[in-house]
């Protein structure tokens, strides 16, 4: 089905939940603590879709590998989770990642655009053996 009638324009839909599923599966396989976490910027479907995928990737890993990795920050059944309420504050990204780390998470996937850079800064300070970040929507290398 072609939605756009402009000949040199193509619309595209990316299944973010599928990419996040793979990230969750990978996180479940890499965690040393058995706890991973996620948080969002704003509670909207483009964000919660990522969080759903991450959660279900961890759950699939658990079912296939006999592990019991726990996901903090999101419940796909109730659609309840952790949200900063913005996509700008690096301080919030740092604080949310710190809280998840303090609860045992050694891998965190912020779904909050540039807010995740605050989480990445915390991971850089703690060291990658302590905390790993899965980046979304922003260049995490800066």
Model-derived features: positions:
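A residue-level marker of the well-folded mature domains of exported/periplasmic proteins
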Residues: 1-142
